Amino acid sequence: MEENKFYSYNHKDLPKGCQYCIKGQKMVIFLTGICPRKCYFCPLSDDKFQKDVIFANERPIISSKELIEEAELMDAKGAGITGGDPLAKLDRTLRYITTLKKHFGSHFHIHIYTTLRLTTEPVLQKLYKAGLDEIRFHPDLD
């Protein structure tokens, strides 16, 4: 099988978030280190694991203003929200999604990585209403 232009063997279209990431156009938002799970394979460092800290591209941030600044510095076309579990801090997650969409417009692609543990229909509706474009679930393997 032949590799594609993304150095992968997948010959279908990659999700938009993946396309931006490969091109270096996606800001990574580490929303919190808090997570309801204790997966044996969790890659978080001791500085982040189960700690309520926020980073944008490994830059510590404490405000929405700093989030926007980091996105502008890298000319981001989108953002991926990860953690811990971003749904452990749902209000913050919703605030950051709406802030980015309001500042950059609806074309700014936002996806989130989360677990099924905190995912409910009302939570999904709030994420959709805030402007989330894509969601990726980590399976329960522990």
Residue ranges and their predicted role:
Residues Q19-T32, L73, G78-G80, G84-L87:
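A short, flexible N-terminal coil/short beta segment enriched in small residues
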Residues D47-I61, M74-K89, H103-T119, V123, ...:
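Core AdoMet radical
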Residues E2-S8, D13-I61:
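Canonical Radical SAM [4Fe-4S] cluster-binding loop centered on the CxxxCxxC motif
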Residues L67-I68, T93-T98, L124:
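Generic structural signal for well-ordered alpha-helices
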Residues P43, L94-G105, Y128:
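Surface-exposed amphipathic alpha-helices with a cationic face
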Residues F30, G80, T93-Y96, L127:
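Conserved short hydrophobic patches within well-ordered secondary structure
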